[in-house]
């Protein structure tokens, strides 16, 4: 098999006359690199691309995807998980791994996912949508049931998710969640083990337990 690693946003600035030659690159276009422990400066990353453009697909990404037998998606975060990249590949007729664009979009929006579960009779914690201004946070912190979770609807990897232990922390959560933008929901907090069960087609894979970090 011939495989190359391509950054979705940075892409490949220089492509040989025959792009197929890239698939024979000795290192698979994967030089030594390290993952920083701090969040990147996204504006600096954008400026590092020659065109400095805001588009999600970097130079030559789609051209290389068209030439691949299959695209293995190793994306993380909203742009990679909300179905937009999957939809673009599907429109181009490019085979790819993972969930389709519709499933990705539904799962990424927590409010839509909750409504699907309720409609299908799948047990899910009590929840509700929140529409409020900063001046309402104090009142809401006294009215919402405790214990609860505050979430933005489109955050992944617990981004925009808050687990307040008391009403003072709940008020802070209601203020802080607004920085993530989009809609906000509250959800009944369930204590217990956290298990993830992936489903491929109609086949459920073995359960995997997520052990949360312990606060100092």
For the regions a protein language model found, what residue spans apply to each?
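ATP-binding N-terminal substructure of ATP-dependent carboxylate-amine bond-forming enzymes
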Residues: 1-102, 106-108, 112, 119, ...
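Structured loop/turn residues at beta-strand edges in well-structured enzyme cores
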Residues: 66, 122, 144
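Structural detector of well-ordered beta-strand residues that form the stable sheet scaffold
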Residues: 97, 125, 149, 185-187, ...
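Basic phosphate/pyrophosphate-binding loop/patch that engages nucleotide-derived ligands
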Residues: 116-123, 176
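Glycine-rich phosphate-binding loop of ATP-grasp-fold ATP-dependent ligases
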Residues: 125-129, 148-175, 194
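Phosphate-binding site of ATP-dependent enzymes
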Residues: 165-216
